[in-house]
């Protein structure tokens, strides 16, 4: 296997799509803390470190879950499953990236490094190893990994946490279950075959649709409070986006199908992305 193919395999295992959203959360966290006159240079080591650590966590995850990935259609073509890279190799490489990423956080401060490491620990040990194979609450508690990214961004500029930082982290935590349950509903049979107790594999499609809608609805007050805290413009933007999310959630309840679940999943990605981008843009104005 050539070096180029090896790099391509690791980029796939590193889940750049997921990592890019975590990076956006970290950048939004940093800009939430930004005040005119403060240097933005600390964002650079935090972002590089967070990216490497997040990719490392994803890569370790692929090594741990290789046997279950083999029976899931969505993951059956991963480089670990088809034999491009071994379990031992990915765990070593992933661990090195996680350690290097955490070390880069120390360039800013110890608190930033702590939150980078916390994201890895929650995703690998709490979510992947402890909770995912055992309880449908896996993704609920695992959502704190995304919160850690936002907090790492915030502390890179402040070396402290405030109410607004906690709100952003809690927003991401509340967003996570509805988002991933939508994907799990689409691939429900995969999770059943792999014996993962993801909520849609445990309670069925109709109940899952209601749980997704309920989770999204419970998140909205946090989003609106966040918008109110930032500015009137943010509150208006967040309200419009939240109305669209609630509309799609209502449609999913009325028509609990995999197609509607996928629409909910795609829009929830867009929803969080626009929320985070709005924070960055508004704080720059």
Curated annotation (Swiss-Prot):
GO biological process entries: heme biosynthetic process; heme O biosynthetic process
Topology relative to the membrane: Multi-pass membrane protein
GO cellular component: plasma membrane
Chain segments annotated as coiled-coil in the UniProt record: none
Disulfide bridge partners, by residue number: none
Signal sequence interval, chain numbering: none
Pathway involvement of the protein, from the record: Porphyrin-containing compound metabolism; heme O biosynthesis; heme O from protoheme: step 1/1
Major localization class: membrane
NCBIfam families: cyoE_ctaB
Family: Belongs to the UbiA prenyltransferase family. Protoheme IX farnesyltransferase subfamily.
Primary role: Converts heme B (protoheme IX) to heme O by substitution of the vinyl group on carbon 2 of heme B porphyrin ring with a hydroxyethyl farnesyl side group.
Protein name as annotated: Protoheme IX farnesyltransferase
Provenance organism: Saccharolobus solfataricus (strain ATCC 35092 / DSM 1617 / JCM 11322 / P2) (Sulfolobus solfataricus)
